[in-house]
Swiss-Prot record:
Presence of the UniProt keyword Transferase in the record: no
GO molecular function per UniProt: oxidoreductase activity
InterPro entries assigned: Nitroreductase, Nitroreductase-like, Nitroreductase_HadB/RutE, RutE-like
Record-given protein name: Putative NADH dehydrogenase/NAD(P)H nitroreductase PXO_03909
Obligatory cofactor(s): FMN
PANTHER family: MALONIC SEMIALDEHYDE REDUCTASE RUTE-RELATED
Amino acid sequence: MSDSLNAAALDQLFRTARTQNAFADTPVSQEVLRELYELVKWGSTAANSGPARFVFVTSADGKAKLKPALSEGNAAKTLAAPVTVIVAHDEDFHEKLPYLFPHADAKSWFDGPREGRAESAFRNGSLQGAYLILAARALGLDAGPMSGFDNAKVDAAFFAGTPIKSNFLVNLGYGDPAGLFPRSPRLSFDEAARFE
């Protein structure tokens, strides 16, 4: 690994980054979203499985399809956001492992009933969703992740007849500070971690 990032980069990724509730009326281009994925795909996952699947909802039709699944408290901000990413995972991710992990027969590790690999798909897809948030911040975007929606409705609307399941949503764009709440505290090291 190379040198540590400078303080400004760490601030942008972590210390001064906020969960955004409102965004400027500025579109996010498909080129930027493709660049975002090109960063996300390099994040580590078990056996290089990369089970996450992303739907970048940007059109009026896409937002209309998403709207019935949103909780009342998340609907307005999600419909107004330039981009809403459905972070999902493919429970048949193992079918791609001969390509993604060619130096071992990793596909055989996950053969069998889908339920047996769903946990790995969820865990590693969640990792990739976190990478997406950090990659977005690295590209100058703001993010508003949330789980206040009906997964079954999203799955029916966007993934019907597939082994893909939604996990959480992330609104993306250029944040409007007027929509921020005061910064909430975080647990100290001693409250959240220990040495053994």
